[in-house]
UniProtKB/Swiss-Prot annotation:
Protein name: Small ribosomal subunit protein eS21
Organism for this UniProt entry: Drosophila grimshawi
Keyword Signal among record annotations: no
Family the UniProt entry places it in: Belongs to the eukaryotic ribosomal protein eS21 family.
GO BP: regulation of cell population proliferation; regulation of translation; rRNA processing; translation
InterPro entries xrefs: Ribosomal_eS21, Ribosomal_eS21_CS, Ribosomal_eS21_sf
Keywords assigned by UniProt, alphabetized: Cytoplasm, Developmental protein, Endoplasmic reticulum, Ribonucleoprotein, Ribosomal protein, rRNA processing, Translation regulation
Length: 83
């Protein structure tokens, strides 16, 4: 869609599940979005960066959300590889 100024505007931008790449629909009320802060390993303080993970309701229904979050955090370097 375009607004009065001629700029492209989307009314709804769907999210994708970080674990399965499925589109999270507007009526998926079981989905969650987690924002995890990046911590400086030397000082233990929060930096300006965050990592955001969206988990769809289907993954949560199967009980796989905790495994998916650990796998994604390992891939992003938030958790050590031998965790």
């Amino acid at each position: 869609m375009e607004n009065d100024a001629g700029e492209n505007v989307d009314l709804y931008v769907p999210r994708k599940c970080s674990a399965s790449n499925r589109i999270i629909h507007a009526k998926d009320h079981a989905s969650v979005q987690l924002s995890i802060v990046v911590v400086d390993p030397e000082t233990g303080r929060q930096t300006d960066g965050t990592k955001t993970y969206a988990i769809c309701g289907e993954i949560r229904r199967m009980g796989e959300s905790d495994d998916c979050i650990v796998r994604l955090a390992k891939k992003d370097g938030l958790i050590t590889k031998n965790f």
